[in-house]
Amino acid sequence: MFKFHDLSLGEALATAVALIAASVSPLAFTYAATGATTMSVLAPRLILPAFLVWIALVLVAPWMGWRRLTSAGRLALVGGVLGVIVMEVVRIIGFRVFHGMPGSLPMLIGVLITNRFMEGPDWLSNLLGWGDHFWNGIGFVFIYYAVFGRQRWWVGMVYALAIATVFMLSPVMNLLGVGIFGHEFAPVKFPLTVYLAHLVYGVVLGWVGQRAASTPNNLLSDLFGWPALRAESRPNAQVQSN
């Protein structure tokens, strides 16, 4: 059977599908922000199926012996949930205390999914909005672990800051009514809040990826045998002793 350097063809294809699935939700939200379609259309047709595909692949990965995909999926659940929690702490402080945000992005996503923009949020829209927000956070962490693998913690920080930059350059800014980098709302407080929120998110995902014993190598290393772009001091002893 065809095999890459340290990755079977089956796992390589499954990883590619999982990466695409993890990318669907943020791309769908960005596309909906252009006005070409709505989240109420994309959520059941694209976002939910992609989420179910990702879950199915992560669940079947251990049974198929896909160690790399198994590790990336499990670590993404840990790093993604923790990362979103600390990110939201910063965002809420920026919103409530310093008025650096126009409102709650998860609540906005929820009313867009349920088509309740004029009526306002309810329990279902909040549930779906926050669920999608956490799924996005998990998806971005999965992409990081599946592609970049073990790196020093600050690489995760750079990755998250890049996400923040793309976010503030995207059509979502027009949907929020704040303009590029929030210059029409709070030209200093908005980008500062977004960058700080993503900074702590990146630190968490980077720290988890560096410290966990099961973090995979970078994808190019496992595919083609390229030098592993990972921390040289692999903390096996510390992690395994806990």
Regions found by a protein language model. Give the residues of each.
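Interfacial helix-loop-helix junctions of multi-pass membrane proteins
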Residues: V97, S170-Y195
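Aromatic-anchored segments of alpha-helical transmembrane domains
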Residues: A21-A32, V84-V89, A160-P171
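N-terminal signal-anchor transmembrane alpha helix
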Residues: A72-F95
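Membrane-interface interhelical connector segments
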Residues: V97-D122
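Short, highly charged, low-complexity non-transmembrane loops/tails of multi-pass membrane proteins
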Residues: P216-N242
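Hydrophobic cores of alpha-helical transmembrane segments in multi-pass inner/ER membrane proteins
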Residues: L48-A61, G139-F142, Y195-R211
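Juxtamembrane "helix-exit" motif on the non-cytosolic side of transmembrane helices
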Residues: P26-T38, N174-F181
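Internal alpha-helical transmembrane segments of multi-pass membrane proteins
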Residues: I138, F148-V166, D222
